[in-house]
Curated annotation (Swiss-Prot):
Chief place of localization: membrane
Summary of the function given for this chain in its UniProt record: Probably functions as a manganese efflux pump.
An MF annotation (GO) of this entry: manganese ion transmembrane transporter activity
Subcellular location(s) per record: Cell inner membrane
Name of the protein in question: Putative manganese efflux pump MntP
Organism phylogeny: Bacteria, Pseudomonadati, Campylobacterota, Epsilonproteobacteria, Campylobacterales
Family membership: Belongs to the MntP (TC 9.B.29) family.
Superkingdom to which the source organism belongs: Bacteria
PANTHER family xref list: MANGANESE EFFLUX PUMP MNTP-RELATED
Annotated Gene Ontology cellular component terms: plasma membrane
Pfam families assigned to the protein according to its UniProt record, in alphabetical order: Mntp (PF02659)
Its membrane topology: Multi-pass membrane protein
Species assigned in the record: Aliarcobacter butzleri (strain RM4018) (Arcobacter butzleri)
Gene behind this protein: mntP
Alphabetically ordered keywords of this record: Cell inner membrane, Cell membrane, Ion transport, Manganese, Membrane, Transmembrane, Transmembrane helix, Transport
Residue ranges of the TM segments: 4-24, 39-59, 69-89, 102-122, 128-148, 159-179
Length: 179
């Protein structure tokens, strides 16, 4: 279960960074924004790994014997992408009004990486539903907090959160590959 908690934390770093950005740009009605951001990000961070998990089960017979290498490569790619985006300054756009459509788009965009990471969940031999709940709930809490961090001048934390998330995903990939 420790692996799932670490994975949940790492996957939530994209949503945390975006939530900080939402808080920086929108200082009005923070409680509602934090709740909506947490719900959107939490639901999609739980849904996408489930889709990846189902895909992993479907592909298992074709890649048996290589599944640890595939999981490592996927987590390495996701982690590397997160680290790259942390250093790429032109990724963010100005968002003046946060609508449900914008939150939905951001939730999908930040959770696509989680779909690939979901493939590795079958390697942990844990209850998938509990794992997805932990991922979703962790993302909800971290996103909720991120809005408040951003509203209090959190510009300095955005890229650090993505770097940390990327490094943790790469380390999880190494653990899967080596143990």
């Amino acid at each position: 279960m420790l692996e799932v908690l670490i994975l949940a934390f790492a996957l939530s770093m994209d949503a945390f960074a975006v939530s900080i950005g939402l808080g920086i740009k929108n200082k009005q009605n923070l409680k509602a924004l934090a709740l909506k951001a947490g719900l959107f990000f939490g639901i999609f961070q739980a849904l996408m790994p489930f889709l990846g998990f189902l895909g992993g089960i479907g592909l298992r017979e074709y890649i048996q014997g290589y599944d640890k290498i595939v999981a490592f490569i996927l987590l390495l790619a996701i982690g590397g992408k997160m680290i790259y985006e942390a250093f790429n300054e032109n990724v963010e756009e100005e968002i003046s009004q946060i609508t449900n459509k914008i939150l939905l788009t951001l939730a999908i965009a930040t959770s696509l990486d989680a779909m690939a990471a979901g493939y590795s969940l079958h390697l942990f031999n844990l209850n998938i539903y509990l794992s997805l709940f932990v991922i979703g709930f962790t993302t909800f809490i971290i996103s909720y907090i991120g809005v408040y961090v951003g509203s209090r001048g959190g510009e300095k934390y955005e890229s650090k959160a993505e770097i940390l998330g990327g490094v943790v995903l790469i380390l999880i990939g190494l653990k899967i590959l080596l143990f």
